[in-house]
């Protein structure tokens, strides 16, 4: 693909609240507020904004924070069974889409640029800044249509029960690239 242009997006910060031992609300200080991106070889950069291992979330004794700290070091799978994953994704200009289906309900919000969402049946939607997609267990892909600019999205993925269509359970499918 050659060299990438500079991202001109604002720095993202993560602010997490918690409680002091006396019950006073405060901000978590052991997890850095400025985020660090993970560059991949599939044309996207990831940032794991937060994870939950279960619902309802175990907030007492910072159990959820401790699990998230572990996930920052030992990256979780795409989805945590029974939980939730919040990710930022920066799409490189002209990156090839990766088709995938997860057993999740995903809320995808375009933060910067434009993204094309395509479902396996061939239908497409061009999403612009501020648009939201609710992805419900379909085989789909995301594409940055720009050849010169990055695009950024925020995803909130919640675990779901598998979709059953015509008596067939549609499970997870990751990594199939269609051109």
From Swiss-Prot:
Biochemical pathway: Secondary metabolite biosynthesis
Domain Cupin type-2 spans what residues? 88-148
Q: Which InterPro entries match?
A: Cupin_2, OryJ/VirC-like, RmlC-like_jellyroll, RmlC_Cupin_sf
Q: Which family does it belong to?
A: Belongs to the oryJ family.
What is this protein's function per UniProt? Part of the gene cluster that mediates the biosynthesis of oryzines, natural products with an unusual maleidride backbone. The two subunits of the fungal fatty acid synthase oryfasA and oryfasB probably form octenoic acid. This fatty acid is most likely activated by the acyl-CoA ligase oryP to give octenyl-CoA before the citrate synthase-like protein oryE catalyzes condensation with oxaloacetate to form tricarboxylic acid.
What name goes with this protein? Answer: Oryzines biosynthesis cluster protein J
Gene this chain is encoded by: oryJ
């Amino acid at each position: 693909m050659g060299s990438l242009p500079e991202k001109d997006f604002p720095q993202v910060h993560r602010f997490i609240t918690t409680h002091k031992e006396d019950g006073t609300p405060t901000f978590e200080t052991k997890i850095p507020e400025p985020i660090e991106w993970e560059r991949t070889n599939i044309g996207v950069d990831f940032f794991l904004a937060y994870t939950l291992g279960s619902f309802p979330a175990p907030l007492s004794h910072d159990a959820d924070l401790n699990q998230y700290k572990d996930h920052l070091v030992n990256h979780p799978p795409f989805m945590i069974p029974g939980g939730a994953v919040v990710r930022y994704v920066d799409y490189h200009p002209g990156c090839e889409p990766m088709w995938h289906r997860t057993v999740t309900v995903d809320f995808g919000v375009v933060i910067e640029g434009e993204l094309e969402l395509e479902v396996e049946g061939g239908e497409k939607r061009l999403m612009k800044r501020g648009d939201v997609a609710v992805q419900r267990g379909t085989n789909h892909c995301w594409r940055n249509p720009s050849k010169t600019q990055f695009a950024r999205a925020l995803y909130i993925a919640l675990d779901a029960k598998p979709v059953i269509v015509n008596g067939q359970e549609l499970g997870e499918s990751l990594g199939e690239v269609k051109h």
